[in-house]
């Protein structure tokens, strides 16, 4: 509330897994009492995520639910998530955007094809140790030539091994990701970039 009182900027509440997330009653109260809150970034497990979508959409001032569940993004969008905020978007935003559009158009075959491509990336980005996820995305950006190398790793994390970097390269190939973006997308807006 103190932050909202200091600005009229829109705000997003981050629901970071069950252990540290706001209980649903508290989340609803925040959304009702703080008009700046326009959305939540939701990293909750499926059952809780769906409850958030249904509850927050039913408020007198509906709140957008933005998924950060990259590993099961298609399911999240089908549940009714309004969009996404994902670290993986630094590498695969075009695939994520196309998946969102396919789900909105109820084009299940296309959505499944895109989710299959995304799967290759999430398997290498979000594997153990989980804390290295952003370092893996940085390495992907370097491998794709989108960012100058070497990828910067902040302590206490350590640089990824060459074996892991090779797995990331294989995943980018399997997902059809190139320097310019995902290969073979139909979206005119993305093709023009």
Language model regions located:
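Structured C-terminal cap/extension of enzyme domains
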Residues: 74-193
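Proteins with a high burden of low-complexity, intrinsically disordered sequence enriched in S/T/G/P/A and R
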Residues: 1, 49-50, 137, 187
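Active-site beta->alpha loop and helix N-cap motifs at the rims of alpha/beta catalytic domains
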Residues: 1-21, 158, 178, 182, ...
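Short, functionally important structural connectors and interaction interfaces within domains
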Residues: 14, 29, 149-152
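Catalytic alpha/beta core domains of metabolic enzymes, predominantly
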Residues: 2-9, 17-130
């Amino acid at each position: 509330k103190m932050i909202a009182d200091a600005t009229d900027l829109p705000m997003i509440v981050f629901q970071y897994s069950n252990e540290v997330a706001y209980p649903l009653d508290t989340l609803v109260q925040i959304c009702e009492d703080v008009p700046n809150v326009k959305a939540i970034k939701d990293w909750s497990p499926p059952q809780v995520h769906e409850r958030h979508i249904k509850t927050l959409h039913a408020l007198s001032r509906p709140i957008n639910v933005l998924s950060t569940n990259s590993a099961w993004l298609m399911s999240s969008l089908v549940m009714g998530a309004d969009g996404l905020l994902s670290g993986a978007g630094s590498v695969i935003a075009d695939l994520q955007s196309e998946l969102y559009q396919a789900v909105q158009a109820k084009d299940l075959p296309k959505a499944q094809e895109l989710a299959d491509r995304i799967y290759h990336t999430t398997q290498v980005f979000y594997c153990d140790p989980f804390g290295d996820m952003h370092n893996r995305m940085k390495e992907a950006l370097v491998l794709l030539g989108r960012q100058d190398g070497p990828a910067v790793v902040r302590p206490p994390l350590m640089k990824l091994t060459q074996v892991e970097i090779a797995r990331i390269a294989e995943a980018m190939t399997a997902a059809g990701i190139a320097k310019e973006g995902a290969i073979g997308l139909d979206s005119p807006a993305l093709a023009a970039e």
